Amino acid sequence: MWLGVVTLFPEMFRAVTDFGVTGRAVSKGLLELQTWNPRDFTHDKHKTVDDRPYGGGPGMLMMVQPLRDAIHAAKAAAGKEAKVIYLSPQGRKLTQQGVEELAKSSSLVLVCGRYEGVDERIIQTEVDEEWSIGDYVLSGGELPAMTLIDSVSRLVPGVLGKQASAEQDSFSDGLLDCPHYTRPESLDGLDVPAVLLSGNHEHIRRWRLQQSLGRTLLRRPELLENLALTGEQEKLLADFVDTIKQDD
């Protein structure tokens, strides 16, 4: 997968290219990431990339010309039709479903805003989609872009050691992940659930599914509203609720 990032702080993306899952993906050639700095497309000695907004008001906006030229350079480097994404709190909220949609693209150009944002005409003429990682304000689009890159790259074939790792992640099936345990078997009086030590794969599968359903009900009940549960899932969830009531 090819990713181009338009940013005033390209050095921030070493966190993506040099570390962890994404770093390994880059080193294996499964993920290619290039950056373009609008400052490199300026025509004045100060490398100015911001300007005052028409109508007044606080803050500055990113200038049109350097940003647009950087986007064009990124699209040209893609060598194919690349989808241009602007990271914005006004965009569609990124969910696992959205991540799966984006992962189907072979190339993406991510535009990271700074200051008070970008000229609306850039969005109208250069941007295909706007995406948000949540209803809060950040200093720029770099962290949202890195979040998007990390989540999308996990779905690129070969990036994770086992595809099952991606399939078992929270939200991969619309549910939160189940609890996980490793050694020791007992920690400060808290024991690993016996079913996980049983070696019975079917019992373990059902326990994990039930815990995933129950955790979603307790922590993110709105997620269940959008799911059509199977008969097995409904039974496991009902048993989970009964167990909670008995414990109370």
Swiss-Prot record:
Any single GO CC term annotated in Swiss-Prot or TrEMBL for this entry: cytosol
Coiled-coil ranges from the UniProt annotation: none
Assign the protein's first listed, main location to one coarse class: cytoplasm
- State the EC number(s): 2.1.1.228
**UniProt subcellular location:** Cytoplasm
* Catalytic reaction list: guanosine(37) in tRNA + S-adenosyl-L-methionine = N(1)-methylguanosine(37) in tRNA + S-adenosyl-L-homocysteine + H(+)
Residues engaged in binding S-adenosyl-L-methionine:
113, 133-138
Q: Which UniProt keywords apply?
A: Cytoplasm, Methyltransferase, S-adenosyl-L-methionine, Transferase, tRNA processing
Report the leader peptide range.
none
Q: Which GO terms describe its molecular function?
A: tRNA (guanine(37)-N1)-methyltransferase activity
Cross-referenced SUPFAM superfamilies: alpha/beta knot (SSF75217)
Q: Does the keyword Oxidoreductase apply?
A: no
Gene3D superfamilies from the UniProt entry: 3.40.1280.10, tRNA(m1g37)methyltransferase, domain 2
**Origin: domain of life:** Bacteria
Task: Please verify whether the record's keywords include Cytoplasm.
Answer: yes
Task: Relate the assembly described in the record.
Answer: Homodimer.
General function of this protein: Specifically methylates guanosine-37 in various tRNAs.
Q: What is this protein called?
A: tRNA (guanine-N(1)-)-methyltransferase
UniProt lists the gene as: trmD
